[in-house]
Amino acid sequence: MIKEYYGAETFILNKDFAYILVIGTTDVSLIPGLTIAGATPELTHFTPAADAEYVLLGKCKSINTIPVSPTGIPTPALLTRASLSFINPLKIVVNAGSRILPKIPYIDLQGEPGKDIRKQALSMEKVNNIMENSIKLGEELSNEYELIMIGESIPAGTTTAMATLLALGYDAMDKVSSASPDNPKELKRKVVEEALRNLPTDSLQRLAKVSDPVLLGVAGTSLGFKGKILLAGGTQMTAAAAIINEFDKNKLKDITIGTTKWIVEDKFADMLSLAKQVGVKVLASMLDLSISAYEGIRAYEKGYVKEGVGAGGSAIMALVRGVSNNTLVRKIDELYSELVGSNNLHI
């Protein structure tokens, strides 16, 4: 049910944990054809706030429906909420820099929304804010927890992740995943190559040029936390791990990426080679959604969406605690049917 890579072990996950969801936006998601993490490029800026609202409340306030792809595939926040319903951990939403603010309680890192990485993603002032405040958040969480799980929501985040990995010296071109079964590699490459021109030499300044607020928020929280960490995400979390490694070479021994089988088995990306380069362990949930009663859920098995909002890590946490595949899929279907019935989902 859970595959282990590079020395990852599931036993470390059998303790109380807090779920941290770091949200933000990047104007890269407005580039047509780059992401399907929203029904239109403009709506992608609503996705992180709506994801956070749905995980906490079971409904969205910022928009009148949960985020869907242009073809109606539901957000992975649905999988996350279903998995966490069996565990009920503390859930904390952290705003690293979202264009649309969620209508729920959240911690603000005093960052800013990411701009177009082909010009300049973030100001150094805001980069410093995000890093300093997220490190402090991680330190505070250490007072209560030995384990945290960090998820992310930022449309076009795989593109900024690829730029981040390349800026930090990793062989990442064309190796990141996509929410679409048709990974727009050529467009990503073009955007990233333009972003990487005339990079400064300083690491933090490089990140300000080509990264995004969420990667910095995830990395900072991890750097400040004293216990074990499950980075719940796909190729984006390899970029977060690369940032962590850039500033603390000893930290990755306490960190594991928790993702989905759809990420590690993605033929159009190579998440495992990225993890190996960075030096981070990986766990993958083998959750099988082919038995779902709903086509929108079964679409995950065809390469749609794949990961996000901590879906893989949350499934791992549920499976480790004895929840069966069938039980988890039934819960996902139940939540999905509630959304369809409440008109909180347009399909």
UniProtKB/Swiss-Prot annotation:
Family (UniProt): Belongs to the UPF0284 family.
CDD domains: DMB-PRT_CobT
Name assigned to this protein: UPF0284 protein YN1551_0030
UniProt-listed NCBIfam families: nicotinate mononucleotide-dependent phosphoribosyltransferase CobT (TIGR00303), PRK04447.1-1 (NF003368), PRK04447.1-3 (NF003370), PRK04447.1-5 (NF003372)
Matches recorded under Pfam families: DBI_PRT
GO molecular function: nicotinate-nucleotide-dimethylbenzimidazole phosphoribosyltransferase activity
Disulfide bonds, paired cysteine numbers: none
SUPFAM superfamilies: Nicotinate mononucleotide:5,6-dimethylbenzimidazole phosphoribosyltransferase (CobT)
Record InterPro entries: Nict_dMeBzImd_PRibTrfase, Nict_dMeBzImd_PRibTrfase_arc, Nict_dMeBzImd_PRibTrfase_sf
